[in-house]
Amino acid sequence: MSENDKRQDAISWDEYFMGICTLSAHRSKDPSTQVGACIVSPDHKILSMGYNGFPKGCSDDIFPWAKMKAEQDPYNAKYFYVTHAELNAILNYQGGSLEGATIYVTLFPCNECAKAIIQSGIKTLVYWEDIYADTPAVKASKRMLDAAGVRYYPYQPTGRSITIEF
């Protein structure tokens, strides 16, 4: 390789943005599920990021992080309170329109996040995991995304690793 040749082992755009999602997910204080999201313009510029957590002003020291079983008190579980990574990324965006953008997520979006993705004008979704594929929320999500013409596809891990030491 001459000094004028470009490096051949640079990470791809998908690797880069999914890496940002993974790093964002590490900001979540949820002990059981950490999700990250990254919204990108058609020309590969990061527009916004988000992770799952409580809304502004709702202390993560006061609100519950517990999961809930059907017979338990729903007010003492996280589900009524946590804002999902996708919605946080959409709400964190301070620019104009998200029309035509791509959202990268570490977990396939639920039906509520799918509504926000569709309404915001995002046209492509890249996801890492789809572990809740058989749930009504994800089935409804896919139905809406399909109807709205939002393209989605799984991220294809390359097996490469990058180490970050803090």
Predicted regions and their residues:
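Zinc-dependent deaminase catalytic domain
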Residues: M1-F166
